């Protein structure tokens, strides 16, 4: 279940994103930028994914120009493959739909395994900006 993250959760969430994205960043010649994460945290809607009483993931939504973007969806390594990412994604879509918005957008590395998850949940490719692709899910 998603719950609103507090300021004290920022370091944990940042470490999760940094660790989960390390291989993709290395592959694409990028470096982790803690200042960028802090700025994104400050400008976004931050949620922890909780299961069995503990934090097992992190999700951030960003509103820009009247649209909502899924900026981060991370699950701790030992809890992947259990449907937690799906659960968080569906809750994020419900949050955005509840605001009366018609779509949720995101950008993801084109070679990320997450692309399959997003496609299974109705996201389609809108643009190709290597190494990223932009995707959108229309919300009924």
Feature names for model-found ranges:
Residues 45-48, 58, 72, 105, ...:
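Short hydrophobic/aromatic beta-strand element in the GNAT-like acyltransferase core
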Residues 119-129:
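Conserved acetyl-CoA-binding loop of GNAT-fold acetyltransferases
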Residues 1-8, 138-140:
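Conserved N-terminal entry element of GNAT/NAT acetyltransferase domains
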Residues 8, 14-41:
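Conserved GNAT-fold acetyl-CoA-binding loop/helix
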Residues 75, 81-94, 116-120:
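Conserved acetyl-CoA-binding loop-helix of GNAT-fold acetyltransferases
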Residues 38-48, 55, 69:
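A short helix-loop-beta-strand connector motif used in the catalytic cores of GNAT acetyltransferases and
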Residues 77-80, 105-115, 131-138:
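Conserved beta-strand-loop-alpha-helix junction that forms the acyl-donor binding cleft
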